[in-house]
Swiss-Prot record:
Region entry Disordered, spans: 82-102
Key words of the record: Host membrane, Membrane, Transmembrane, Transmembrane helix, Transport, Viral movement protein
Major localization listed first in the record, in broad terms: host cell
Compartment annotation: Host membrane
Single Gene Ontology BP annotation: transport of virus in host, cell to cell
Protein name (record): Movement protein
Amino acid sequence: MYPAKYQVVPSGINYSDTPVGTFEQYQPQKAGESSEHFFSKVVVALIVILFAVGIVYLAYTLFLKDLILLLKAKKQKTTTEIGFGNTPLRRPGEGNPNGGPV
């Protein structure tokens, strides 16, 4: 008979019946060490950050712009030049009704 071209069973040098690793190596990971637990923390952190950014954006668009405008007006001690919404235009010949600088 011809010699086998491929060896189906490994040779005795590379093969042994006893496992190489110890029993502790094959124990499953604890729940706190899994990558799924870490991923869930990342997802929760991203949701909290997006929620906080959304609240800040809504607060700015709804009332913080008006509050900043009001504080600037109080700092200037006059609210005549500050317009809310559509304000009528001045005609060039009218000038300042108070007589002071603009």
